[in-house]
């Protein structure tokens, strides 16, 4: 691999000269473009830390600290660009050097916190600060914690994962084109939940739970996550006293000792129609 000096209004950067970069430069010179080339050009600009192909300005220290606020991390050193190391500080006052890119995009956190045991009170405070509830004991930063998010979803995330920005997998879904309220069932219970991809979710639950005969009974397409969450909560409240009591896998609290047909009848009272029917 060779290197090539790219000039951008009086600034020159020595970067790896790959076929992708060669293609980006050539297309820029002759005025041609395509979605693929635009993405490559954007990555090239981000690599150099001077903005992107859409003309957006590079991030400021204030921008980065706002993005990192819920992780308890902030920049305290000089900021040059995303690929140049600077000094970060965590909420326990540890300082270390890292590139902004590794903190923002690779989700790396404080190396001192990940290697040291912290008190249960401090763990509880970190979790409550993001609106979550701790439902299990704390062993170490790399052992998954049983958590409940502020939307009532049960999930399993390590303390390291929380520090790196991981959150409830249900709440992190993007619902621009709508999503699904689904009903899954097997010989020992029925599960009601929400997902963008119910078939994929079925495989995940089967793998984590070991319920090999679990199957997708039916689903309902909904326009936004808020509507789906409200209906999911209605079902969970209705059958609260019939919860199966499963644990130790994501979605374990969403199983009920109820026939799936009964849940369909309950949802019909909200005027819902089964997807594809």
UniProtKB/Swiss-Prot annotation:
Q: What induces it?
A: Expressed in the late phase of the viral replicative cycle.
Give the keywords, sorted: DNA-binding, Endonuclease, Hydrolase, Late protein, Nuclease
Which Pfam family would be a valid example here?
MUG113
- What EC number(s) does the entry state? 3.1.-.-
Q: Which domain of life is it from?
A: Viruses
Molecular-function GO terms, alphabetical: DNA binding; endonuclease activity
Q: Write out the function statement from the record.
A: Putative endonuclease.
Mind telling me what this protein is named?
Putative endonuclease
**Which organism does this sequence originate in?**
Escherichia phage T5
């Amino acid at each position: 691999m060779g290197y090539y000096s790219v000039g951008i209004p009086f600034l020159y950067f020595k970067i790896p000269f790959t076929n992708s970069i060669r293609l980006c430069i050539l297309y820029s010179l002759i005025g041609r473009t395509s979605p693929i080339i635009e993405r490559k050009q954007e990555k090239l600009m981000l690599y150099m830390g001077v903005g992107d192909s859409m003309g957006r300005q590079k991030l400021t220290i204030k921008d980065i600290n706002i993005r990192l606020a819920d992780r308890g991390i902030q920049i305290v050193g000089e900021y040059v660009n995303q690929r140049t190391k600077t000094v970060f500080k965590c909420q326990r006052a540890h300082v270390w050097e890292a590139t902004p890119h590794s903190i923002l995009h690779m989700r790396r956190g404080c190396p001192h916190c990940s290697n040291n045991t912290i008190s249960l009170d401090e763990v509880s405070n970190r979790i409550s600060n993001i609106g979550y509830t701790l439902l299990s004991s704390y062993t170490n930063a790399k052992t998954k914690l049983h958590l409940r998010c502020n939307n009532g979803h049960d999930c399993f995330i390590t303390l390291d994962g929380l520090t790196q920005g991981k959150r409830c997998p249900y709440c992190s879904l993007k619902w621009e084109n709508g999503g699904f309220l689904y009903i899954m069932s097997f010989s020992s219970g029925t599960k009601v939940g929400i997902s963008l991809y119910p078939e994929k979710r079925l495989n995940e639950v089967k793998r984590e739970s070991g319920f090999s005969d679990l199957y997708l009974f039916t689903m309902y397409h909904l326009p936004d996550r808020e509507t789906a969450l409200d209906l999911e909560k209605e079902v969970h409240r209705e059958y609260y006293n019939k919860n199966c009591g499963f644990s130790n896998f994501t979605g374990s609290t969403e199983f009920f000792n109820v026939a799936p047909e009964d849940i369909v009848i309950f949802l019909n009272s909200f005027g819902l129609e089964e997807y594809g029917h």
